[in-house]
Amino acid sequence: GEYKYVDLDESGTIDENDRCIIGDPNPDWTSSLGIDVQWKNLDFSIFFNGVFGNDVVNMASFNQPNNSHLRWTVDNPTNEYPRLNMNRQTKFSDWWVEDGSFVRIQNMTLGYTIPLSKKKLARNVRFYVNVDNLYTFSGFKGYDPEVGMTGIYSGGYPRLRKWTIGADI
């Protein structure tokens, strides 16, 4: 019911000589893509950003109750997670390292423009709906795979999704 560590130096004991570099918080590449389309009086824009090839240490998953039903027990010794233990030493291992790659729909806007007479104060009125942080495509188990340069995710609140309805006059 405990984690197993590899004796890398084959000395017969697990000690500081068995440590090695696990993962890399630096992405192999980052990308973004913006698309703007207009058709008649409709306009649509969408902006994607993504990060690929980085690793994230998910510290929020150390002893989480949401997976306690998948923990090792005497009755079921083949479960995915080790037994619950409040006194476990949390030596880092690849157990907590996850792929931090993601693609996010950062912003999306849909608008409609109503042309007005040129004699009026305004030439046209545009109504729009905008959403920030619409969706994130990722295999990461935490709320948000976009972490700082340390590559450590400690939990916290997820990014907010913000809806805006407006008019340009």
Where are these regions (language model features)?
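Repeated loop/turn-to-beta-strand initiation elements of outer-membrane beta-barrel proteins
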Residues: 41-44, 117-118
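Long hydrophobic segments that form regular secondary structure
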Residues: 24, 28, 33-42
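Outer-membrane beta-barrel pore domains and translocons
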Residues: 38, 49-51, 130-134
